[in-house]
A protein has these predicted regions:
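A short coil-to-beta-strand element that immediately follows conserved catalytic motifs
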Residues: 100-109
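Conserved hydrophobic/aromatic beta-strand scaffold that supports enzyme active sites
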Residues: 53, 63, 124-126, 146
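Conserved Nudix-box catalytic region and its N-terminal flanking loop in Nudix hydrolases
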Residues: 56, 60-95
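Acidic, metal-coordinating catalytic segment for phosphate/diphosphate chemistry
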Residues: 4, 10-51
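Structural detector for helix-capping/boundary residues
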Residues: 50, 77, 91-92, 147-150
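Nudix hydrolase/Nudix homology domain
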Residues: 2-16, 70-71, 138-177
């Protein structure tokens, strides 16, 4: 299967082959996810994650689908030990979406994800200048796409939709994820 990059003219998605391990992960994820979260909740009292709102020249927003969880999300992930949140969002963008930030990410909002994951906090950044680069998220990312904010896929999570509106339109952010 040919892999198309988001820098190719007229291409709205980066797609890759759906391999059997990815399908297997999607089938067992609903059962294993609560166990993994419970383990990390007791092992680490506080977790910090980052997400990025990135738009292209047409005003489309970058979203992605993971192989292990259903829905469309803003790119991002966890902040690693010894890493700043700003460094983490730049790293996650490159790893997951093949996007290299050319400008310093701007912090838009901070949220608690206490209801779903006690002790979890998420920082949302806006990246305005970027270029494509090689992604190394094989096995983790199923699909990457660019969507107009008013035409997001049906499977886009409610929190993702709220963060996009807050970041793009300057609306007051909800402190809860």
């Amino acid at each position: 299967m040919t892999r198309k990059l988001c820098s190719d003219p007229g291409v709205a998605f980066i797609t890759g082959p759906r391999t059997e391990p990815m399908l297997w992960r999607r089938r067992i994820e609903p059962f294993t996810r609560p166990l993994v979260y419970a383990f990390f909740r007791f092992r680490r009292g506080l977790t910090l994650g980052v997400r990025a709102v990135v738009t292209d020249g047409e005003g489309r927003v970058l979203l992605l689908q993971h192989t292990y969880v259903h829905g469309w999300y803003l790119p991002g992930g966890g902040v690693e030990r010894g890493e700043t949140a700003e460094t983490a969002v730049v790293r996650e963008l490159a790893e997951e979406a093949g996007v290299r930030a050319l400008s310093r990410p701007r912090l838009v909002s901070a949220h608690s994800n206490e209801i779903l994951h006690p002790g979890d906090h998420v920082l949302v950044y806006r990246v305005e200048a970027w270029e494509t680069c090689a992604s190394n998220a094989a096995g983790e990312i199923h699909e990457v796409g660019w969507f107009h904010p008013h035409e997001l896929p049906e499977e886009t999570t409610r929190a993702t939709r709220r963060r996009i509106v807050e970041a793009l339109h300057g609306e007051e952010s909800d402190p809860m994820w």
